[in-house]
């Protein structure tokens, strides 16, 4: 089957890889000159299934009001003048209760755990290198309340069979030796030993090279104007004077998916702006070994080979990519507070990206009401964590195979009353 994938971020490229491996003729289209040059370029570097959790959580509405008056707040909201933003925020608020939180987190952890397994299998079969580490993730608590609240997340981890360690502050240095100097500032931590880290951009670029060698066609510097459709079928992608035709089309444009699908399929994917610093390592014994997640500031500090990536925060501000100095100061403050000898902060590279977020935090994956239009978007802050699993899942559904995990609750059907996703079926031209 001929498949066109719109988007060459980590989700688009992993989709291309798995579809190609399933025997399909795949073309990837992107406006950028190469893969992973937007949201996948400089994210926090975490592959953290156990910490897969929606921003829509109990207590967030009240916290959001408090954060409005804090200099280093993890979340900020500025109205962008669109009804879509207001509707999206209302839908998010409706997910901020315990029942929705547990349901959403459960399916996010399910997909993320599967995705990590897919990444391991891909690494074993291809030998792909991306400055990855398998040292786990350590979530740090600065208050007694945060430490106590961890029991709620532990219940979800236990249900999903995810191993964990709840550590008192005196034991944090056993996992991250450099924290010995600052343990007095912390109340404890939650460690997930099976989590991983890695450079998402490097991974995506190298996988794109492998995919191209395997037969995938990449059309870069190719802006997409619109999808062409008739009845319940997409019949082409208009790119300037060209119309690119295929048997199936996959939307993986991240935050730009919503606008591209306007009038075709309604999906609640909104840009969640985040920031990062990439810092050269100064003293190896003063830098993190793997990934740290600061629960107070919602900031991750991740170790690559000779670099430290500090990323986080969320701004609901529309398609604004301005680099704000106060956000840089927050990132610098957190990394200096936890790892004062770790990096040359003054040499850091400052970056921002737009994560494609749904109100419930879960991506939308699968077929739409158009029989040959598929979605793989809306992964929010977890695109790197969920990419391989999402790509394999999409490939299985599109190819008519039964996926390894349940997936009905990942469909756009949860936002489209009356639409029921079809079960896997053997499509004309699919290779199995």
Curated annotation (Swiss-Prot):
Kindly state which reaction or reactions the protein catalyses: a D-alpha-amino acid + A + H2O = a 2-oxocarboxylate + AH2 + NH4(+)
The enzyme's main class, written as a single word, is oxidoreductase
So what EC number does this one have?
A: 1.4.99.-
Keyword Flavoprotein in the entry? The reply is yes
Q: In which pathway does it act?
A: Amino-acid degradation; D-alanine degradation; NH(3) and pyruvate from D-alanine: step 1/1
Give any single GO term for biological process. D-alanine catabolic process
Recorded hits in InterPro entries, A to Z, give: DadA, FAD-dep_OxRdtase, FAD/NAD-bd_sf
Q: Which family does it belong to?
A: Belongs to the DadA oxidoreductase family.
Main role?
A: Oxidative deamination of D-amino acids.
User: What's the protein called, per UniProt?
Assistant: D-amino acid dehydrogenase
The organism of origin for this protein: Citrobacter koseri (strain ATCC BAA-895 / CDC 4225-83 / SGSC4696)
Upper lineage is: Bacteria, Pseudomonadati, Pseudomonadota, Gammaproteobacteria, Enterobacterales
């Amino acid at each position: 089957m001929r498949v066109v994938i719109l988007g060459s971020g980590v989700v688009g490229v992993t989709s291309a890889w798995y579809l190609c491996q399933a025997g399909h003729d795949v073309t990837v289209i992107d406006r950028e000159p190469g893969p992973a040059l937007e949201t996948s370029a400089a994210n926090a570097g975490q592959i953290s299934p156990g910490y897969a959790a929606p921003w829509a959580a109990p207590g967030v509405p009240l916290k959001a009001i408090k954060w409005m008056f804090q200099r280093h707040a993890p979340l900020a909201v500025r109205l962008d003048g669109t009804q879509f933003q207001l509707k999206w925020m209302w839908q998010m608020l409706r997910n901020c209760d315990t029942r929705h939180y547990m349901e959403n987190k459960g399916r996010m952890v399910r997909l993320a755990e599967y995705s990590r397994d897919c990444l391991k299998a891909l690494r074993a079969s291809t030998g792909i290198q991306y400055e990855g580490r398998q040292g786990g993730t350590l979530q740090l608590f600065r208050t007694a309340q945060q430490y106590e609240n961890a029991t709620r997340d532990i219940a979800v981890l236990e249900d999903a069979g995810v191993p964990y360690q709840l550590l008192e502050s005196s034991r944090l240095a056993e996992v991250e030796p450099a924290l010995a100097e600052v343990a007095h500032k912390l109340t404890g931590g939650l460690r997930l030993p099976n989590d991983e880290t890695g450079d998402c951009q490097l991974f995506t670029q190298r996988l794109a090279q492998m995919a191209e060698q395997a037969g995938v066609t990449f059309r870069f510097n190719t802006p997409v104007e619109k999808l062409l459709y008739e009845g319940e079928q997409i019949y082409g992608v208009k790119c300037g004077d060209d119309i690119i035709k295929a048997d199936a089309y996959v939307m993986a444009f991240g935050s730009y998916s919503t606008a591209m699908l306007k009038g075709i399929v309604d999906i609640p994917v909104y840009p969640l702006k985040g920031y990062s610093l990439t810092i050269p390592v100064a003293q190896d014994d003063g830098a993190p070994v793997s990934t740290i997640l600061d629960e107070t500031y919602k900031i991750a500090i991740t170790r690559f080979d000779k670099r430290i990536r500090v990323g986080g925060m969320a701004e609901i501000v529309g398609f604004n990519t301005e680099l704000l100095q106060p956000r840089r100061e927050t990132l610098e403050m957190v990394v200096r507070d936890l790892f004062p000898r770790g990096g040359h902060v003054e040499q850091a590279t400052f970056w921002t990206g737009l994560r494609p977020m749904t109100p419930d935090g879960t991506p939308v994956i699968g077929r739409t009401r158009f029989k040959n239009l598929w979605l793989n978007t809306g992964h929010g802050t977890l695109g790197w964590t969920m990419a391989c699993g999402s790509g394999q899942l999409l490939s299985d559904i599109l190819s008519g195979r039964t996926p390894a995990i349940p997936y009905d609750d990942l469909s756009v059907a949860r936002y489209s009353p009356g639409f029921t996703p079809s079960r896997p079926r053997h499509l004309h031209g699919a290779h199995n």
